[in-house]
UniProtKB/Swiss-Prot annotation:
The name this protein goes by in its record: 3-dehydroquinate synthase
Taxonomic source organism: Nocardia farcinica (strain IFM 10152)
Gene behind this protein: aroB
Alphabetical list of InterPro entries matching this protein: Dehydroquinate_synthase (IPR050071), DHQ_synth_AroB (IPR016037), DHQ_synth_fam (IPR030963), DHQS/DOIS_N (IPR030960), DHQS_C (IPR056179)
Domain of life, per lineage: Bacteria
Catalytic activity, EC: 4.2.3.4
Function of the molecule: Catalyzes the conversion of 3-deoxy-D-arabino-heptulosonate 7-phosphate (DAHP) to dehydroquinate (DHQ).
Catalytic reaction list: 7-phospho-2-dehydro-3-deoxy-D-arabino-heptonate = 3-dehydroquinate + phosphate
Length: 373
């Protein structure tokens, strides 16, 4: 069996992202080595992963650890204050202390919620992330962001809490629905546009091979996307400057998610947001036509949407006012000044926003709705 590869996230408290197959042994080692005297572990998992959670529990129990499974709601429904409260109650009931560890098992919503719970329980306990979706592997699990949603917006309540380790078990991708792979490609393609054009070349060479979890291309894309994020996070953990580039496509994307009450997959919303950001860059005279057009072509090649409701702009603008990058009511977007040259666009004129939105507007219902809902 091929040895796992490791990417070190070199923040003040460095941690590894381990990429491979069959990483149960690595998980046990990461948990037992997280802190001295680990006695209790809480495994937060989403319903489809009950069997996997039990395998993890037994493996930890075999080392003498008192391991507990804690089921949380699937997808964005889990990123709720009431769910976080339930998790805190469980941690209190099982007696989880600062010497103990939390494990997250699931998609991005699971890593966001479990990370938030770990960050706030006793002002911070160790957590090991085991992302099981493509999006979680290349984005949510790496970087230390945690959060829950409120009526005011997505991820507005949260904090930074870095994991002890992230275990990316590629074998889990062979059992997830294809739609999850497609949705996760949005974050990989984003990494290509902001930092690593080789990602774009690999996807464009054979889009279907890029979506094959059993083939050689997707693991390389995952490794490259994680490396991009690791490099950015190491330079700017708390999003004071450089890290904002990871939000490319997310300003409109988060607004779409909120308008759709989180029925759209995150990756689908970000895909539309990427095209919108490219159009903003083009119309602002900062991005060349070929690179702007490349956004739409590559996203459509893997089956992601690139348009949204024509009449939605007023609602989306309202939602974008709560975006974390907005300052004193001034909208701020990440745009490109060329391939792998991210920059910022502050306070764009309303006419520019309207023109960019007209380039992604559609009147009819979206095709391929299965990947959205």
């Amino acid at each position: 069996m091929t040895e796992p590869s490791r990417i070190q996230v070199r923040t003040a408290d460095p941690y590894p992202v381990i990429i491979g197959r069959g990483l149960l042994g690595e998980l046990v080692e990461s948990v037992t080595g997280a802190t001295s005297g680990v006695r209790t572990v809480a495994i937060f998992y989403q319903p489809p992963l009950a069997e996997t959670a039990e395998v993890v529990r037994k493996a930890l129990a075999d080392t003498g650890i008192d391991a507990h499974r804690v089921e949380i709601p699937d997808a964005e429904a889990g990123k709720d204050l009431a769910v976080a409260g339930f998790c805190w109650e469980v941690l209190g009931r099982i007696g989880l202390t600062r010497n103990d560890v939390v494990v997250s098992l699931g998609g991005g919503a699971a890593t966001d919620l479990a990370g938030f719970v770990a960050a706030t329980w006793m002002r911070g306990v160790r957590i090991v992330h085991v992302p099981t979706t493509l999006l979680a592997m290349v984005d949510a699990a790496v970087g230390g962001k945690t959060g829950i949603n409120t009526e005011a917006g997505k991820n507005l309540v949260g904090c930074f809490h870095e994991p002890t380790a992230v275990l990316v078990d590629l074998a889990t991708l062979e059992t997830v629905p294809r739609n999850e792979i497609v949705a996760g490609m949005a974050e990989i393609i984003k990494a290509g546009f902001i930092a690593d054009p080789v990602i774009l070349e690999l996807v464009e060479r054979d889009p279907q091979a890029a979506l094959d979890p059993a083939g050689p291309v997707l693991p390389e894309l995952i490794r490259r996307a994680i490396q991009v994020k690791a490099d950015v996070v190491a330079a700017d953990l708390k999003e004071s400057s450089l890290r904002e580039i990871l939000n490319y496509g997310h300003t409109l994307g988060h607004a779409i998610e909120r308008r759709e009450r989180y029925r759209w997959r995150h990756g689908a919303a970000v895909a539309v947001g990427l095209v919108f950001a490219a159009e903003l860059g083009r119309l602002a005279g900062r991005l060349d036509d070929a690179t702007a057009d490349r956004h739409r072509t590559i996203l459509e090649a893997v089956g992601l949407p690139t348009t949204y409701d024509a009449d939605a702009l007023p609602q989306l603008l309202d939602a974008m006012q709560t975006d974390k990058k907005t300052r004193s009511g001034v909208l701020r977007f990440v745009v490109l000044d060329g391939l792998a040259k991210p920059g910022r666009l502050e306070g764009p004129d309303p006419s520019l926003l309207a023109a960019a939105y007209s380039a992604i507007a559609r009147e009819e219902s979206p095709s391929g709705g299965a990947i959205l809902l």
